């Protein structure tokens, strides 16, 4: 599956894999770190949603680590291959469409997940690294879950 990710030109990094990386989770850190190393080596554009920045920064502030939250922002804004994508009107409407489509199936997603998936869609991601297998039924992009890497 990592080989498939290596074919990507625009990789969307969802919240779950990023959180596992920051936690240095023993089961997932090596895989996520390896994927990011490969992305830098192959000059793959890595997208993250501003929703993800909100989610990880919230945790930092809850733990009294405001400096860490600002470091996350700095990383997203200054990293060469990483782009923090805003939730604008187009992303919001696409998220509403995805959320409604998912609610009509057994592949439910949360509002935050729909915003993140819409961010990937609107910004042209051809691969999504996530923990949410339900993204597969809602996206034409290659969806790779952490369990698969």
Model regions: which residues?
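Acidic, PIN/NYN-like endoribonuclease modules and their adjacent C-terminal/linker elements
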Residues: 1-10, 38, 82, 117-149
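Short, well-structured N-terminal submotif of metal-dependent ribonuclease cores
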Residues: 1-48, 61-74, 133
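Active-site neighborhoods of divalent-metal-dependent phosphate/nucleic-acid chemistry enzymes
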Residues: 2, 82-127
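Conserved glycosyltransferase catalytic-site signature
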Residues: 15, 50, 89, 111-114, ...
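General small-molecule cofactor/ligand-binding pocket signal
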Residues: 47, 85, 144
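Short, hinge-like loop/turn segments at secondary-structure boundaries
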Residues: 63-67, 102-103, 144-148
């Amino acid at each position: 599956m990592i080989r498939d990710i290596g074919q990507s030109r625009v990789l969307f990094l969802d919240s779950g894999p990023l959180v596992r990386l920051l936690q240095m989770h023993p089961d997932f850190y090596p895989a996520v770190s390896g994927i990011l190393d490969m992305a830098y080596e192959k000059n793959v554009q890595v997208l993250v949603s501003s929703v993800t920045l909100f989610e990880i920064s919230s945790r930092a502030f809850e733990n009294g680590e405001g400096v860490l939250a600002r470091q996350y922002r700095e990383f997203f804004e200054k990293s060469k291959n990483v782009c923090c994508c805003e939730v604008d009107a187009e992303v919001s409407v696409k998220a509403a469409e995805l959320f409604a489509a998912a609610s009509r199936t057994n592949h439910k997603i949360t509002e935050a997940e729909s915003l993140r998936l819409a961010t990937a869609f609107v910004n042209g991601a051809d691969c999504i690294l996530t923990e949410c297998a339900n993204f597969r039924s809602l996206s034409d992009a290659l969806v790779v879950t952490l369990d698969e890497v």
